[in-house]
């Protein structure tokens, strides 16, 4: 069981709502994934129309919504988006995203740390999306973040665990849950993230852009479960040389 702040999750696969062909496919894929935490960009919600077809089906499915501040270019904009989410959606959970560069969508470490400090002081449950920077993740813990969400590779790139060496350090040092976010493009990569000891992964593009999103969601669900079980079982130590599995006392007693 995974616990973030005061909430327990049976599923360690978090999902998103973007890039699906329509809301019905999105809902069916999320249902198939068994995800219990789904992120949604505040900029995609039309509050003038009330709770539209993006939010209503998700709430009916019983998943927890995690609004994000995607599109914010600085701490001020991110704090505004978070406060709007709390007022309109009735949640103090927020995925903090600040990426001023529209081409590569790299998170701004300085603005993210400042926004995290402000939001934690305001009583938010903050899950910041950041570079795989062990020092930054520790600083975010210190200001009160409930979890950290280091990237595996650029958002939507499907490149996999490009930052694996740094993710290992973050996982080793973290005192809050580590959710690997962005760039996971295949179930095998999600399984690998879990084998490293990550507490959860967030996957969106790899599911939504699949030719069969519902089947792919099921594949990710199973991969995350297997990866976590492998981590808990204890993976064998990696050796630089060969290690024999049978006695080296001669051949057939000769």
From Swiss-Prot:
List keywords of the entry alphabetically: Cytoplasm, Schiff base, Thiamine biosynthesis, Transferase
**Which EC class does it fall in?**
transferase
Entry EC no(s): 2.8.1.10
Q: Where is the active site?
A: 95
Per the database entry, which stretches of residues form a coiled coil? none
GO cellular component terms given for this protein? cytoplasm
GO biological process annotation, one example: thiamine diphosphate biosynthetic process
Task: Tell me the residue numbers annotated for binding 1-deoxy-D-xylulose 5-phosphate.
Answer: 156, 182-183, 204-205
Judging by the UniProt lineage, the source's domain of life is Bacteria
The pathway this protein participates in, as annotated, is: Cofactor biosynthesis; thiamine diphosphate biosynthesis
This enzyme catalyses: [ThiS sulfur-carrier protein]-C-terminal-Gly-aminoethanethioate + 2-iminoacetate + 1-deoxy-D-xylulose 5-phosphate = [ThiS sulfur-carrier protein]-C-terminal Gly-Gly + 2-[(2R,5Z)-2-carboxy-4-methylthiazol-5(2H)-ylidene]ethyl phosphate + 2 H2O + H(+)
UniProt subcellular location? Cytoplasm
Give this protein's Gene Ontology molecular function annotations.
thiazole synthase activity
Quaternary structure, per UniProt, is:
Homotetramer. Forms heterodimers with either ThiH or ThiS.
Which family does the similarity line name? Belongs to the ThiG family.
Q: What does this protein do?
A: Catalyzes the rearrangement of 1-deoxy-D-xylulose 5-phosphate (DXP) to produce the thiazole phosphate moiety of thiamine. Sulfur is provided by the thiocarboxylate moiety of the carrier protein ThiS. In vitro, sulfur can be provided by H(2)S.
Q: Report what the protein is called.
A: Thiazole synthase
Q: Which organism's genome codes for this protein?
A: Shewanella baltica (strain OS185)
| Organism phylogeny | Bacteria, Pseudomonadati, Pseudomonadota, Gammaproteobacteria, Alteromonadales
């Amino acid at each position: 069981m995974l616990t973030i702040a005061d909430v327990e999750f049976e599923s360690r696969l978090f999902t998103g709502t973007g890039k699906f062909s329509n809301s019905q496919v999105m809902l069916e894929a999320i249902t198939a994934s068994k995800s219990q935490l789904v992120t949604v960009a505040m900029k995609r919600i039309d509050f003038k129309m009330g709770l539209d077809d993006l939010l209503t089906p998700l709430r009916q499915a019983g998943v927890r919504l995690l609004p994000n501040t995607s599109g914010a270019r600085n701490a001020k904009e991110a704090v505004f988006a978070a406060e709007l989410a709390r007022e309109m959606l009735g949640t103090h959970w927020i995925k903090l995203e600040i990426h001023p560069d529209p081409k590569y969508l790299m998170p701004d470490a300085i603005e993210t740390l400042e926004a995290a400090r402000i939001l934690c002081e305001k009583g938010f449950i903050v899950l910041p999306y950041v570079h795989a920077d062990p020092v930054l993740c520790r600083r975010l813990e210190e200001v009160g973040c409930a979890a950290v969400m280091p990237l595996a590779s650029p958002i939507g790139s499907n490149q996999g665990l490009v930052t694996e060496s740094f993710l290992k350090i973050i996982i080793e040092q973290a005192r809050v849950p580590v959710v690997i976010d962005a760039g996971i493009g295949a179930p095998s990569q999600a399984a690998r993230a879990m084998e490293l000891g990550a507490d959860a992964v967030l996957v969106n593009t790899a599911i939504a852009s699949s030719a069969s999103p519902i089947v792919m969601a099921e594949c990710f669900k199973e991969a995350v479960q297997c990866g976590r079980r492998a981590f808990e079982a204890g993976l064998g130590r990696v050796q630089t040389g060969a290690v024999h599995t049978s006695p080296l006392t001669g051949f057939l007693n000769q």
